[in-house]
Amino acid sequence: MEHLLEVKNLSVSIDGPAGEVQAVRDVSFSLKKGEVLAIVGESGCGKSVLCKSIMKLLPPSAKIKEGSICVNGQDITCYREKEMQKLRGRVFSMIFQDPMTSLNPTIKIGKQIGEAVVIHNKNYTKEQVNKKVLELMELVGISHPKERYHQYPWQFSGGMRQRCVMAIALAADPDILFADEPTTALDVTIQAQILDLLREIQMKLGTATILVSHDLGVVARVADRVAVMYAGKIVEIGTAEEVYYNPRHPYTWGLMRSLPAFANGKESLYTIPGMPPTLIDPPKGDAFACRNEYALNIDYEEMSPMFKITDTHYAATWLLDPRAPQIKSPVGGTAHE
């Protein structure tokens, strides 16, 4: 299947008060039509910057230093704002973290969704716009859409506001939907509902989705593939089954061990020791080495390449080198077989 989105060797930096932050470092991945790719990692690892780089929503202080971004085979890396405006909404759209900051509290929900419809369908009559708005509200599970159409965001619960934001994002039937931690501000029960809704919409419309999260447990129920990101780099990528049931990178082991499902009830919940490195001056070698209890000497000297485990599963750890000692994974299996 042809790739809908292909990112190759992408590096993005941001100028800050203390220096240049290397937010995204040599990242490559692809996305097929109708696929759900989850990007997981700690806060500050570059997940959101990566997505905003693709949509060209970066602040003026940020710039793409290297790499390419191709959509439907077309290289958009050097596209300017005018060209990107034609792609946003129709080719890709984004759901942000906090729905309350994405909605105008003084404008009725129906009008806000309608504005998104009109931007991409300028020839629509008022009746056509209203019909499309009601269809979108039904699609995202907003009950009694005709009545809710005339209500304000503050009259909706957090989960319902997120559904409104999803309706706006889907107004132009995008090919790719970026969901940037869409459940962070919601309670656990509502999180599950929103994730199920994302999966339902993806299956109904065939929309490819990139789901950003810091929680491996959250994405388990919806992802087809999972990319684990650390310090601006993808350190492991594979199908959801491969990453969950046969993780190979020590950082992925740490994320898995920190899930409540792995706790036995007698010991404290596992936490990864230390702090992520500064990306103003990333450490030599593997950025995770100083937090990695399984680190080898070479980890402190040289960055690991991506080792192929299967045709769909790759991990950047020297433990997969045939010369490395065989380490038993704390979450099952071994580092290399």
Indicate residue ranges for each PLM-predicted region.
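Short catalytic/signature loops enriched in Gly
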Residues: 3, 143-146, 239-337
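The feature captures the beta-strand-to-loop junction immediately N-terminal to the Walker
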Residues: 40-41
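P-loop NTP-binding/switch modules centered on Walker-like glycine-rich loops
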Residues: 56, 178, 182, 186, ...
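Conserved ABC ATPase "signature" region
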Residues: 74-75, 127-147, 256
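A short, proline-enriched helix->beta-strand linker immediately N-terminal to the Walker B motif
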Residues: 171-175
